[in-house]
Amino acid sequence: IHHRLVGSEMCIRDRIKPIHTPGHASNHYCFLIDEIKCLLSGDHIMDGSTVVIAPKDGNMNEYISSLKKLNDFSFDSIAPGHGNFIDNPFEIIEWTIQHRLEREEKVHKKLSKLGAVGINRLLISVYNDVNPKLLPIAKWSLEAHLIKLIEDERVVLEKGKYRSLED
């Protein structure tokens, strides 16, 4: 917890605004403390990293929408549930959105190149820039990206293999 929050006593009623931010989990909330213009982001946003979106409870479409929703609020900092305090909140939010969309495009391009492929082969191809020890966790995010691409009608799953619909 950042020094701005340590030792502070607050009456929660009417001072903290809950913001439903599904994506990491369906029941995830961020909390906005208007008085100090700080967003308590829980597991929604972290400094220097992205959070895991693990289906079935996590959903990439909802996650990206929730990130965009935060642009409608006014705050100067983010206190994440893990990691460092964030003093450039809207830059980090935009970076996170772009990172997710770029990863999604990488998934789609690999599918277009590889054709119908199982998730494990796709995982190695898409997350070739990730420490191999992290691949089991990356697989959850890959699955979330694939579900989003299916929801967006860009990919189909047939007989255990994913295929681009935009070949």
Question: Language model features by range: what are they?
Answer:
Residues 1-12:
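Single conserved hydrophobic/aromatic residue that forms the stacking wall/gate
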Residues 5, 67-70, 111, 146:
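Generic leucine side-chain signal with a strong bias for well-ordered alpha-helical environments
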Residues 16, 37-39, 155, 162-163:
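Hydrophobic residues embedded in beta-strands of well-ordered beta-sheets
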Residues 17-106:
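Metallo-beta-lactamase
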Residues 109-167:
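C-terminal regulatory/interaction regions
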